[in-house]
Amino acid sequence: MTVKLVLASKSPFRSALLKNAGIEFSTASADIDERAVEAPLYESGATPEDVAQILAEAKAIDVSEKNPGAVVIGCDQTLSLGDEIFHKPHDMEAARRQLQKFSGKTHQLNSAVVLARDGKTLWRHVSIAHMTMRDLDAGFIGRYLGRVGDIALSNVGAYQVEGPGIQLFEKIDGDYFTIVGLPLLPLLAELRREKCIDG
């Protein structure tokens, strides 16, 4: 295949998912202010799914304009509990508060992936996972945060299901790749349709 693929993310985990799938690509960071993009969206009543898609698209478009001819993969994930939207916690106290809010409830992860070339969107997709946390007491939350440390601050929701964070959950409805922030199977299918990968 001669199409250059670029992942518009410096996330080592997203890179690892693509590498493990046998995809050849480079990475580049998008130059966008995510909070500035999403604030008016929420004010206008956009859903968390819409926001994830728009942010993924903004990243893909930005990087595609700087990489002529390349097909760029943009990704984003939002987490919502009812009408409340959550971001990565900025400190351990914020992580503790998030986990207390999620305790015994079902929140939603919205993972978007977009393909763009030369500033134009080729394809967009959003997958949703429903995550039900078990009832967590304050002592367990404190021990969990002590165990995972700064990993809690690098993830929306203060957890990684691929590590000790899985112990927080009672039930999960959704695809693993949606949960970790890159809907891989729909992405691979579209990359094959676009003749970007063999298939």
UniProtKB/Swiss-Prot annotation:
Active site: D76
A GO CC term attached to the entry: cytoplasm
One function term, GO molecular function aspect: nucleoside triphosphate diphosphatase activity
Site positions (Important for substrate specificity): F13, Q77, E162
Location(s) in or outside the cell: Cytoplasm
EC number: 3.6.1.-
Catalytic reaction list: N(7)-methyl-GTP + H2O = N(7)-methyl-GMP + diphosphate + H(+)
Cofactors: a divalent metal cation
Swiss-Prot/TrEMBL keywords: Cytoplasm, Hydrolase, Nucleotide metabolism
GO biological-process terms attached to the record: nucleotide metabolic process
CDD domains per record: Maf
Location (main, coarse): cytoplasm
Highest taxon, organism lineage: Bacteria
Pfam families in the cross-refs: Maf
Enzyme class: hydrolase
UniProt xrefs under InterPro entries: ITPase-like_fam (IPR029001), Maf-like (IPR003697)
Function: Nucleoside triphosphate pyrophosphatase that hydrolyzes 7-methyl-GTP (m(7)GTP). May have a dual role in cell division arrest and in preventing the incorporation of modified nucleotides into cellular nucleic acids.
HAMAP family: Maf
Family as reported in the entry's similarity comment: Belongs to the Maf family. YceF subfamily.
Protein name as catalogued: 7-methyl-GTP pyrophosphatase
